[in-house]
């Protein structure tokens, strides 16, 4: 049950901890164990509050202009703010979100007016295990937005993970990764992990974050088709807080010396820790389990 506070917040308990939904008018910001996780504008879900989600929207629009239909895989569900926005902006699209927390995956439909399947399906499981179960060339875009205590899980940033993402993407598809940088995290190593699988790479970030002056988000865009950098740059300049694209020689210079993340060698007991455990179920099964 939710319990309201004088600040206009409500609190819920899920498998991974406590969720606070903090309301500011129609905007609901979701915190998981005190860490800002999602924000939904309930009056107009197409409005994206988080800057990195605005960057992801620009990156997608540069290749697949709205309202073009897409099929998207979202690794990391939380409150499904980005799938909801894209479902609103692109009617007829199909979104699959993967959330590792069964309680959270089921509860977000009670908290927010999310589209039902097939517009938006929510699957419970490990992001990599679910992606590895997908057929080749299934998606136009894959979004990786997964964090555990402020860090991207190790098995979701390796060369092997990038290889699986390329397999599941269509030939003209986009791989969008929300990376942490600064404060002990290095997005440049994530870019290095993508190089063997994706020929077109760029990053979007605040210049201060790029210089490691402060911790922040870096959105990495990966593709194997000619990516319209100029169009992306034009769209980013229209945002309330314009962002900078780093690509080509500038990206090579920024990432110089960065070493890719590798999966551990498989042991005789089976797949290494970085692969993650396959623990998936449909949202319907998850709902029945909670009933």
Where in the sequence are the language-model features?
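S-adenosyl-L-methionine
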Residues: 31-32
């Amino acid at each position: 049950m939710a319990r309201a506070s004088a600040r206009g917040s409500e609190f819920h308990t899920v498998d991974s901890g406590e969720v606070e939904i903090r309301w500011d008018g129609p905007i609901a910001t979701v915190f998981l164990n005190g860490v800002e996780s999602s924000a939904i504008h309930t009056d107009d879900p197409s409005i994206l509050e988080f800057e990195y989600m605005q960057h992801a929207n620009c990156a997608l629009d540069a290749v697949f202009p709205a309202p073009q239909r897409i099929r998207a895989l979202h690794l990391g569900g939380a409150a499904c703010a980005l799938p909801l926005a894209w479902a609103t902006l692109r009617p007829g699209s199909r979104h699959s979100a993967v959330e590792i927390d069964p309680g959270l995956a089921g509860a977000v439909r009670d908290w927010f007016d999310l589209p039902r399947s097939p517009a938006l399906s929510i699957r419970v499981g490990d992001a990599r295990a679910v992606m590895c179960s997908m057929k080749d060339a299934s998606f136009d875009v894959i979004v990786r937005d997964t964090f555990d205590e402020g860090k991207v899980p190790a098995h979701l940033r390796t060369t092997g993970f990038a290889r699986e993402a390329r397999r599941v993407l269509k030939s003209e598809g986009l791989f969008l990764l929300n990376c942490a940088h600064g404060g002990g995290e290095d997005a440049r190593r994530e870019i290095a992990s993508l190089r063997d699988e994706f020929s077109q790479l760029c990053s979007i970030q605040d210049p201060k974050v790029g210089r490691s002056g402060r911790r922040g988000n870096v959105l990495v865009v990966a593709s194997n088709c000619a990516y319209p950098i100029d169009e992306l740059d034009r769209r980013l300049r229209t945002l309330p807080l314009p962002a900078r694209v780093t690509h080509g020689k500038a990206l090579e210079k920024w990432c110089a010396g960065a070493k890719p993340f590798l999966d551990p060698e498989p042991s005789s007991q089976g797949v290494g820790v970085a692969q993650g455990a396959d623990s998936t179920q449909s949202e319907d099964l998850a709902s029945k389990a909670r009933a």
